[in-house]
Amino acid sequence: MQRVTITLDDDLLETLDSLSQRRGYNNRSEAIRDILRSALAQEATQQHGTQGFAVLSYVYEHEKRDLASRIVATQHHHHDLSVATLHVHINHDDCLEIAVLKGDMGDVQHFADDVIAQRGVRHGHLQCLPKED
C-alpha cells in the first residue's frame, strides 16, 4: 500500500470528515478508498461490453391502465438479464419491485430505462456493480 498526500479546500475536508463520521469510517483513508472504488465501479458499468450485476428498484401504481402487464412484458422481453424479482405491496395502490439483473451493462441500462420510462412508474433507481474477475 502506498501513502499519498492530497490537498483539499477547507469545505471539502469538512464534508469528507462529516461523511466519514456518519458512515463510521475509522479514518479518512478508508473513506477515500471507498469513494474511489465507487467512482471506478460507476465508470466501468457505463461501458457497453462490461459484464456485471445490477439492482433495479421502482414503485408503480398496480391499477394504472395496463401498467403491470407492460412491465411484465418488458421483463419477459429481457428475460436473459433477470436473475430474480421481489414484489412488495406498499399500500392499496402502490407496489415496489426490486429486480436483480446480470449481464452486459449496456443492456441492463436499456432494460432499466424501458421500465422507468413507463407512465405510472416512480422512484426508479438502478445500482450497478461491475463483475470482478
UniProtKB/Swiss-Prot annotation:
Annotated keywords: DNA-binding, Metal-binding, Nickel, Repressor, Transcription, Transcription regulation
Cofactor binding comment, as recorded: Binds 1 nickel ion per subunit.
Binding site for Ni(2+): 76, 87, 89, 95
Gene Ontology terms for molecular function: DNA-binding transcription factor activity; nickel cation binding; sequence-specific DNA binding
Cofactor: Ni(2+)
Keyword Calcium tagged: no
UniProt-listed NCBIfam families: nikR, PRK02967.1, PRK04460.1
Function: Transcriptional repressor of the nikABCDE operon. Is active in the presence of excessive concentrations of intracellular nickel.
Family to which the UniProt record says this protein belongs: Belongs to the transcriptional regulatory CopG/NikR family.
SUBUNIT field: Homotetramer.
Protein name: Nickel-responsive regulator
